[in-house]
């Protein structure tokens, strides 16, 4: 694939992600009910939102992987880096595979670090890459951590996608040689418990569930196919909420992404065991539709509302939130029981 073809594909992904963006997502958060406390017995000043992570993050949200690899997406990455710095949140790069193949595309990713010189940045490679490529991706961004993305469904539907999914040896090798923490993530189809246990056996500690309900790369890649013949995979995978239930009790440090649309969604994900929550489609949508300044104001208010919701629930930190009363819908409770998953 030529550089122009690679760049065009990256631009297509952004266009289609925005085209298929849904303001009301179907990630399962509507099936989770946090119960109101009439006597919260707390103060907003007492709320500590700092996540229980060894990354020194100040907020329990981060901007998740999106883009890079073309002049247009490079401009978006510059805005995203600037936004992350202004908000004081971590940010993950889009997949750097194209820049590893073509060094001329490196600036479209490195602009994240240029605009967020002191922030926490996660590099990003696919699980098909070896340890040397992972090291190069980290060096490209002077990254603080590395995401390894799992995207089998996307690759199957992508006309030019990979067809080799023998990934576990690569993951194990990257973990063994990496100088930075590793986060293994799905890109929108979620996890089941068996795969999470396999990751544990490889030495993985940090997992982003990347559940169904947000940006759907199977749908995006199907739109790029002439016959659009994979439409039936639109609902493939486990939702973000189902994936969090699958992870309970395993001892992994979970991050949650996929279909997060509100501060309440964030708090629900945290209550289900996520230590931090990522957003990508929401951020991209606001940047494209409203511009940088309005997006910054929106997410500043978003962060403030997290503090308000903690106080409303009568909790002051993540540990206390784990004890907040919660009810699952009948369908979600049936899923939990059918899968033999721990209670909440």
Curated annotation (Swiss-Prot):
Subcellular localization: Cytoplasm
Chain coiled-coil ranges: none
UniProt cross-references to InterPro entries, sorted A to Z: Aldolase_TIM, FMN-dep_DH, IPdP_isomerase
Main location per the UniProt record: cytoplasm
GO biological process, one term: isoprenoid biosynthetic process
GO CC terms of this entry: cytoplasm
Enzyme Commission number: 5.3.3.2
Keywords: Cytoplasm, Flavoprotein, FMN, Isomerase, Isoprene biosynthesis, Magnesium, Metal-binding, NADP
Enzyme type, top EC level: isomerase
Sequence positions that bind substrate: 9-10, 154
GO molecular function, one term: FMN binding
Record function comment: Involved in the biosynthesis of isoprenoids. Catalyzes the 1,3-allylic rearrangement of the homoallylic substrate isopentenyl (IPP) to its allylic isomer, dimethylallyl diphosphate (DMAPP).
Subunit structure: Homooctamer. Dimer of tetramers.
Family per record: Belongs to the IPP isomerase type 2 family.
NCBIfam families: IPP_isom_2
PANTHER family assigned: ISOPENTENYL-DIPHOSPHATE DELTA-ISOMERASE (PTHR43665:SF1)
This protein's name: Isopentenyl-diphosphate delta-isomerase
The species this protein was found in: Lacticaseibacillus paracasei (strain ATCC 334 / BCRC 17002 / CCUG 31169 / CIP 107868 / KCTC 3260 / NRRL B-441)
Taxonomic lineage: Bacteria, Bacillati, Bacillota, Bacilli, Lactobacillales
